Amino acid sequence: MPVYVDYETPADLAERSLEALEVARDTGTVKKGTNETTKAVERGNADLVIVAEDVSPEEIVMHLPELAEEKGIPVVFVDTQDEVGHAAGLEVGSAAAAVIDAGDADDDVEDIGEKVAELR
């Protein structure tokens, strides 16, 4: 497990998070990539942050979980950058993504946030 991963995300929660990201991408607003995700978290605009566990070097996303926790934003860890990128609508992998406006996935994002709070 990478240094920046605070807790083990259950597979079903990771899958629900990726599905919520896909719905938010189509009906709301998402930010893709480490830089855009970091800006969204710093501004307090993000409702949910998804970070891949296979990022190398780890320092690229190491700051995100701590920053999101300071802002009260739930963070979900998924296995690969390809999963994050695909769910965010990219043809390539992405180390991180943020849901800004959940759109039709609003209830799912809220429920995911509650489950993440229980895991921490």
Swiss-Prot record:
The keyword Zinc does not apply. NCBIfam families: eL8_ribo (TIGR03677). GO terms for cellular component: cytoplasm; ribonucleoprotein complex; ribosome. Part of the 50S ribosomal subunit. Probably part of the RNase P complex. Keywords: Cytoplasm, Ribonucleoprotein, Ribosomal protein, RNA-binding, rRNA-binding, tRNA processing. The keyword ATP-binding does not apply. Its main location: cytoplasm. It is found in: Cytoplasm. HAMAP family: Ribosomal_eL8 (MF_00326). One of its GO terms (biological process) is translation. This is Large ribosomal subunit protein eL8. GO terms for molecular function: ribonuclease P activity; rRNA binding; structural constituent of ribosome. Belongs to the eukaryotic ribosomal protein eL8 family. Multifunctional RNA-binding protein that recognizes the K-turn motif in ribosomal RNA, the RNA component of RNase P, box H/ACA, box C/D and box C'/D' sRNAs.
